[in-house]
Amino acid sequence: RTCNKTFSDQSKICPPGENICYTKTWCDAWCSRRGKIVELGCAATCPKVKAGVGIKCCSTDNCNLFKFGKPR
């Protein structure tokens, strides 16, 4: 499986056994100015998250795209 990874401009091959791509989003103290923090990666199962954290999981190559807004 290949998934998009945080801080990478190319998709990466996931480690053996990690066949799920995910996009995790959440807010920090700067959310109103910078927008949500986004984490992209691979996992063996869809990660469990706390309240206030968004998660989207998928199981095809490079399916965890995230469109960032234009800088203000």
From Swiss-Prot:
Pfam families, A to Z: Toxin_cobra-type
Tissues and organs where the protein is expressed, per its UniProt entry: Expressed by the venom gland.
Disulfide bond entries: 3-21, 14-42, 27-31, 46-57, 58-63
Superkingdom, taxonomy of origin: Eukaryota
Role this protein plays: Binds with high affinity to muscular (alpha-1/CHRNA1) and neuronal (alpha-7/CHRNA7) nicotinic acetylcholine receptor (nAChR) and inhibits acetylcholine from binding to the receptor, thereby impairing neuromuscular and neuronal transmission.
Family: Belongs to the three-finger toxin family. Long-chain subfamily. Type II alpha-neurotoxin sub-subfamily.
Designated name of the protein: Alpha-elapitoxin-Dpp2b
Organism whose genome encodes this protein: Dendroaspis polylepis polylepis (Black mamba)
Upper taxonomic lineage: Eukaryota, Metazoa, Chordata, Craniata, Vertebrata
